[in-house]
């Protein structure tokens, strides 16, 4: 489960990450990554580690399918954030904001496929 301090909650912040952040995609999802520079315009949520949020629209499937995809993606993000906390060279910085947007292909994807897609997109974004 994604820890509360790592959740992205504000709709305004979701919009900012999607608009200002860099993005990379795969067949199953699109990852938006935004790492703001500290300063007067920076969001207040810059402490407590990276924050992540999900966008799973009706295009993915009915409510049961959307919730299943959300659970899988939340678990993937929690794993990545936990591993980054102990890694020598983490993919996500302390001030990073990540939004993962699920595409219709994610409904048929396994957890391993989703995890590899998220990791691949994040590695391409953090270059």
Curated annotation (Swiss-Prot):
GO terms for biological process: tRNA 5'-leader removal. GO terms for cellular component: ribonuclease P complex. The keyword Acetylation does not apply. The keyword Nuclease applies. It comes from the Bacteria. Keywords: Endonuclease, Hydrolase, Nuclease, RNA-binding, tRNA processing. GO terms for molecular function: 3'-tRNA processing endoribonuclease activity; ribonuclease P activity; tRNA binding. Pfam families: Ribonuclease_P. This is Ribonuclease P protein component. It comes from Corynebacterium urealyticum (strain ATCC 43042 / DSM 7109). The lineage of its organism: Bacteria, Bacillati, Actinomycetota, Actinomycetes, Mycobacteriales.
